[in-house]
Curated annotation (Swiss-Prot):
Binds 1 zinc ion per subunit. Its cofactor is Zn(2+). Signal peptide: none annotated. Heterodimer of a catalytic subunit qtrt1 and an accessory subunit qtrt2. GO terms for molecular function: metal ion binding; protein heterodimerization activity; protein homodimerization activity; tRNA binding; tRNA-guanosine(34) queuine transglycosylase activity. It is a peripheral membrane protein. This is Queuine tRNA-ribosyltransferase accessory subunit 2. Keywords: Cytoplasm, Membrane, Metal-binding, Mitochondrion, Mitochondrion outer membrane, tRNA processing, Zinc. Its main location: cytoplasm.
Amino acid sequence: MKLELSRVVQGCRLGVLTGLGKSGQHSLEVPGCLLHTRCATVPHLTQDTLLTLSDLPAVTQVSVDSLAEHHEVLEEFKEGVRKFAGLHDTVIFCSLHDSASPSPAGHVTNKTVSVWGSGGRIELTAARFMSIQAAVQPDCYQSMADGETWQANTSRKRVRKAVDRTLAHLDECLVLHQKTQELKHAEIFGVVEGGDILEERLRSARETAKRPVGGFVLDGFHSSAMDQDVRAQLIQETSAELPQEKPRLVLGVGRPDEVISCVEAGVDLFESFFPFQVTERGCALSFNYTIDPDPETAGTSASTVLECNGETPEVKKPSANEDVENMTPFEINLKDKRYRDDFRPLVEGCVCYCCQKHMRAYVHHLLVTNELLAGVLLMLHNMAHYLGFFKALRDAITSDRLQDFKNTVLHRRQGD
């Protein structure tokens, strides 16, 4: 696995991650995202339905928390999760947690970490963690880590302990990795911890970079962890300590504005759990990412964000409705009664199956009647929109129009 950078513009790294998979024939453009799954399946979508989407990421993300409870089945199968789940020809990346469902804190020791499955907490030693990786047979995977120091009130002593534990876990995983035949072609990603303390972030990055890892996972930067400006500064200074030729994956960052900020700070890869979260709220991604819109569709039905009438996007204030409370300024709530008689596509000009075949009113009907098809159509649209956003981001960096792209995504909107 090798990261070949073609451009570095104002901190943004444009390139291709090559040599992926056992055959080394796969590649992934950066900045880019992994394909988020639960139990090795994209939520709401069958494999055939998923493959109707274009520009799917070459790397599929699975997580230990969704596989740990029944990994004995994978051990008996002996051919890994890719074949077990009937996945297409893809590269498997195995993370520790599913960022779409934050885990309870307070269950990490010097020797163990905990993940949460459907049956509750599962405590993992390094040996058990590596036995799960051997059963999954990923192409690359995240090392064990103590990632519970993202809270604002975490003491410096606790953060230092988390960095020490994470480095110790990495060393133990590296030893077991060398002894595991099923992982002889796999790459291990070291985890950079340190909370919001720059000194510990730098120490974690420097020490992790000394180990024989294939890439780096930047943990503890998810949306609720810290202010966006603080996150960007920490990532930028931490990234300066990491080798240029190895990829950097940030966990827990999915909102378009946060993705752009992290790309400017030097991040290469992201997860794609955000479209799933939007789908679960009964919402559709509707933000505009086209710098030069098609003149035939421009002005007919502008892509809107919370129907905000051109206002700069802000997170909605908490309300009694949990779905509305968690909404971001990049989506529309199709459960809202205003869409009952709205016969337009979810986003004008979108080429996804949902927008080509159906209208807002129909998806609204499916949602209020609790039809399973609602999740299928929304997931198809949201994934297509999110993947289109990343492609447009790469194109903007290529053409030196990142600022125009940011203005388009964050500010240049008109109300419906």
